[in-house]
A protein has these predicted regions:
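Ligand-binding clefts/hinges and TM-proximal coupling segments of bilobed small-molecule sensing domains
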Residues: 24-31, 36-40, 87, 162-182, ...
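C-terminal motif of bacterial Sec signal peptides marking the signal peptidase cleavage site
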Residues: 17-21
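Extended ligand-binding regions for polar small-molecule ligands
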Residues: 23-25, 74-83, 148-149, 153-154, ...
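Acidic, polar ligand-binding/catalytic clefts
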Residues: 78, 87-149
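A ligand-binding cleft/hinge motif common to bilobed small-molecule-binding domains
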Residues: 97-100, 113-122, 166-169, 195-196, ...
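Bilobed "Venus flytrap"/periplasmic-binding protein-like clamshell domains
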Residues: 55-58, 69-82, 114, 135-188, ...
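Periplasmic-binding protein-like
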Residues: 55, 131-138, 206, 214-251, ...
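Short helix-initiation/N-cap motifs at beta->coil->alpha
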Residues: 74-75, 89-100, 181-196, 232
Length: 285
């Protein structure tokens, strides 16, 4: 009886192992059965591209009125996936956690107005595709017309953003004139603070500034100062060393630039200055 019980237990354990193995293959939820992003894109034609993005960074990635994730970068990613028979997974992330998401391979790349300048050695990069600059937005009735008007003012900036890096780096002398420089999680919050008077100015990307201002009920209530804080370029960031996936995406982007698809997609966001900011095919890294 004891031997029979042992035999039954062994048989049950073996069956459980087989079933678990089958289940993990179908669901893709088991770590042991999960291929790295680098391996899967090379080996499988019908795989997925998981794009990490900040869902409050228009016009590059954001949620529209119908609740769908849209934006210029996501449109580019969708076209890349369509041409490679991949499924696009749009994965919103906390911008502060982007490196952890990428290094753990829960996402395959960061594609969302991602500045490459100063980070060249931290990721494997695509070629740049957007020339960007950091600017300051104020209320039109604020009396602030240039950087000197920011003295003693409350300025907000997104955490871990290029504007923050500039104000803590090359433009630290400018930031020293502010009453304070407060960090917020996303720019929707910053604009609500600007509307209410909780802050006097916002330092941010020009594309996002154009979108936020033009989408307000009264866009004339805001203005963008003429002088820029800094300039930079956007590129797609992959995990360091993932050159195989980067090369495949880059090849497809180059084809899209050559046949006019990138320009066509950019025209959808003409109100936010995207066509004029394109540099893909014009610059080489």
């Amino acid at each position: 009886m004891k031997k029979r019980l042992v035999l039954l237990l062994v048989t049950a354990m073996a069956a459980t192992t087989v079933l678990a193995g089958c289940g993990s293959k179908d669901s893709g939820s088991s770590d042991s059965g999960k291929k790295s992003a680098k391996e899967s894109k090379v080996e499988n034609d019908d795989d997925t591209l998981i794009v990490g993005f900040d869902a409050s960074f228009p016009p590059y990635g954001y949620k529209d009125d119908s609740g769908e994730y849209v934006g210029f970068d996501l449109d580019l990613a969708q076209e890349v996936c369509d041409r490679n028979d991949w499924k696009l997974v749009k994965q919103p992330i906390d911008w502060d956690s982007k490196d952890g998401e990428l290094n753990s391979e829960t996402i395959d790349c960061i594609w969302n107005g991602f500045t490459m300048n100063g980070r060249e050695d931290d990721y494997t990069w695509s070629d740049p595709y957007i020339d960007n600059k950091q600017v300051v937005v104020v209320r039109s009735d604020s009396g602030i017309d240039d950087f000197s008007g920011l003295k003693g003012k409350h300025v907000e900036v997104q955490t871990d953003s290029s504007a923050l890096a500039a104000l803590e780096g090359d433009q630290k002398d400018l930031a020293a004139t502010f009453a304070d420089l407060n960090q917020v999680a996303e720019y929707n919050t910053a604009f609500m603070d600007l509307e209410s008077g909780a802050c006097d100015a916002i330092a941010m990307d020009i594309g996002v500034a154009n979108y936020q201002v033009n989408s307000r009920k009264n866009p004339d209530d805001y203005k963008i100062l003429d002088k820029e804080i800094s300039s930079e370029q956007y590129a797609v960031g992959f995990k360091k060393g993932n050159t195989e996936l980067k090369d495949k995406v880059q090849k497809t982007l180059d084809e899209m630039a050559e046949d006019g698809t990138v320009d066509k997609i950019a025209e959808k966001y003409a109100d936010y200055g995207v066509p004029g900011a394109l540099c893909i095919g014009k610059n080489s890294k």
